[in-house]
Amino acid sequence: MELQFLGTGAGQPSKARNVSSLVLKLLDEINEVWMFDCGEGTQRQILETTIKPRKVKKIFITHMHGDHIFGLPGFLASRSFQSSEEQTDLEVYGPVGIKQYVMTSIRTSGTRLSYHVHFKEIDENSLGLVMEDDKFAVYADKLDHTIFCVGYRVVQKDLEGTLDAEALKAAGVPFGPLFGQIKNGQDVVLEDGTKIIAKDFISAPKKGKVITILGDTRKTNASVRLGLGADVLVHESTYGKGDEKIAKSHGHSTNMQAAQVARDASAKRLLLNHVSARFLGRDIGKMAADAKTIFENTHIVRDLEEVEI
């Protein structure tokens, strides 16, 4: 499981950073890639990676500002051009208006998609659980931005314990159907009368990962709720230390406020993105150092960077 950041800048592209987009790679878990936001130029960024567009099965949009959605119609169209590869349907989650925006762009440009796009629009009345399958659940909560904006909490369900095959062999269990029964939690009796207690040969379930990805926001308790105990918290850092007033007026956060959220949420790691173009080189180092005075495990991500979870 990895995060890869396709765009880490704020507002508009710069020479160092493209606008907002990242992917959560779940290839080992479910053979899928999930995208979060799709700003202008996202598909160009993908060309610099190993990401295959057909593997992108779900797209989660945080809000309707252009730097988070202007790349979406183009990405969907390019995904359709992969005619030599199997086409699979795609799900788009986002605020009310995302369906109209995408479909209007598709229709007016004469684009034809070779797959179906299923939309799940989110409003004040549909916050909470927005997606669930047998491996993952995704929750959304409203943040505090200048327009309706959400953050997402991706929860991997606990993984089943593993079967200790060597211990079973040592106990005299023949390889075959009995292994499957024991793996399913069934106690078995061998031909010689030996009773095998399944739980003695299965490790404890492994706790699933929690990944929190926030959209643009002022400092808010919703960010803490979404980030509670997260293995990774992705939080915007449009502004730096001392910029709290201007950050609030523009609906954004500083690095220090993001660090406070991570601390209050007891997150394990804080990844800062959505960085203003005015922060370069030495400024980035200071921004990270300042945030670490509040939350030590802080890192400012750069475009195309991969982070293992």
Curated annotation (Swiss-Prot):
Residues reported to bind Zn(2+) 1: H63, H65, H145, D216
Question: Under which EC number(s) is this enzyme classified?
Answer: 3.1.26.11
Q: Which reaction does it catalyse?
A: Endonucleolytic cleavage of RNA, removing extra 3' nucleotides from tRNA precursor, generating 3' termini of tRNAs. A 3'-hydroxy group is left at the tRNA terminus and a 5'-phosphoryl group is left at the trailer molecule
In its UniProt record, a GO molecular function of this protein is:
3'-tRNA processing endoribonuclease activity
Give a yes or no for keyword Cell inner membrane in this entry: no
Which keywords, in A-to-Z order, does the entry hold? Endonuclease, Hydrolase, Metal-binding, Nuclease, tRNA processing, Zinc
Cofactor(s), names only, from the UniProt record = Zn(2+)
Q: Where is the active site?
A: D67
Positions of Zn(2+) 2 binding: D67, H68, D216, H274
> What does this protein's record comment on cofactor binding?
Binds 2 Zn(2+) ions.
Matching entries from InterPro entries are given as:
Metallo-B-lactamas (IPR001279), RibonucZ/Hydroxyglut_hydro (IPR036866), RNase_Z/BN (IPR013471)
Mind telling me which HAMAP family this protein's record contains? RNase_Z_BN (MF_01818)
Assembly behavior: Homodimer.
User: According to its UniProt record, which protein family does this protein belong to?
Assistant: Belongs to the RNase Z family.
What PANTHER family does this protein's entry cite? Answer: ZINC PHOSPHODIESTERASE ELAC PROTEIN 1
Which purpose does this protein serve, as stated in its record? Answer: Zinc phosphodiesterase, which displays some tRNA 3'-processing endonuclease activity. Probably involved in tRNA maturation, by removing a 3'-trailer from precursor tRNA.
**What protein name is recorded for this chain?**
Ribonuclease Z
Source organism of this protein record: Streptococcus thermophilus (strain ATCC BAA-250 / LMG 18311)
The lineage, from the top, is: Bacteria, Bacillati, Bacillota, Bacilli, Lactobacillales
